[in-house]
């Protein structure tokens, strides 16, 4: 597919991408609980017409598109995470979270929408590539050890020649991509910080070691 024609196809998909992203944003689900999210993605992928859809894990999803173009066949995987965070959304957007205490605050709704758009572009460009495009919707990225381990153990990336991960970033201007070969922000972890102090009267802060103030400064 020529570069200009592909760019025009992407721009034509913008309204649909926005609709996908806003739907996902309105109905966020926490790690390992993405049942409705995965069901929505599966319905959309079926409508798009991908060649194969698999559920290798309870809430993970893999879609495959096979190309019929000339050249050496290769299997290229693209991964997007789909889970939300356990935090409230404090705005009045028409597509704000409808789930109390849960929101897409890390862009995973956008990631999933982009991967759906890629699926549609690839289905319409089968003759432009040879081999397989494997689209992996990863559950539970936010909660270690995460859904990636489950997908790996389930064989979701077996036979993949090259793998692309993606993440939105406020470090770049709109429309700008940053690319790095190898590992980049490929781990997540949690830790607790314990602040010890000695409380006292707020009128005499100099006579106590207030743990609240210390924690706020940490």
Where are these regions (language model features)?
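Acidic/His- and Gly-rich active-site-bordering loop/insert found
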Residues: 2-104, 109, 113-129
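Histidine/acidic-residue-rich, glycine-tolerant segments that coordinate divalent metal ions
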Residues: 62, 85-87, 91-103, 109-110, ...
